[in-house]
Regions:
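A helix-coil-helix interface module used to build multimeric assemblies
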Residues: 1-177
Length: 178
């Protein structure tokens, strides 16, 4: 959907004129209101096509069929995109969303909980170990603080990773885009 909207915003692609607000609203609603029933419909189409991305393409064509403006350019829904272009970008978006909405918030909660334990047990003595052998005295709080600092460092590294995708055709040379 976003690909089709982007095509309509390119002056150089005259075959896909700029969409009206109504057509853009319809496309936005397909994304925003995507339902389990929609997913079932795609799986139903896929049983015929034996191709996941082609099933999504046909589903989108069904959704825009009653809009004359979008129906007129529906062959551009999959224009210049291989299935891998679509899939890897989808996977990248899903991974990024999972990282931002699930993983990092959970790790933040974990860091906070371990930091609280470090404060709570800051005076509780324990024997530190090195190579599995008793070493020197420390506190449970200090050891928990070490874990929190190390986890925070790893969290920052995970957050800094750029999750990328590609959209450059079957062999990466943009031939379909020319």
């Amino acid at each position: 959907v976003r690909w089709l909207q982007m095509l309509s915003n390119q002056e150089g692609i005259q075959e896909v004129p700029a969409f009206s607000p109504q057509s853009n609203a319809l496309l936005d609603s397909i994304v925003a209101e995507f339902s389990v029933d929609d997913a079932r419909r795609i799986k139903e189409i896929e049983r015929t096509t034996n191709h996941d991305v082609k099933a999504v393409e046909y589903f989108l064509k069904e959704k825009v069929a009653d809009n004359s403006e979008l129906n007129a350019i529906n062959e551009f829904i999959h224009f210049a995109c291989t299935s891998e272009d679509i899939n890897n970008l989808s996977h990248a978006l899903m991974c990024n969303a999972a990282r931002e909405t699930v993983i990092l918030p959970y790790v933040d909660q974990l860091i906070d909980a371990i930091t609280d334990l470090a404060r709570k047990y800051r005076t509780v003595p324990m024997m530190a170990r090195t190579h599995g052998q008793p070493a020197s005295p420390t506190t449970m709080g200090k050891e928990m603080a070490n874990v929190a600092v190390r986890l925070k460092r790893q969290r920052e590294q995970i957050a800094a990773v750029s999750i990328l995708g590609k959209i450059n055709g079957a062999v990466g040379n943009y031939n379909a885009h020319l």
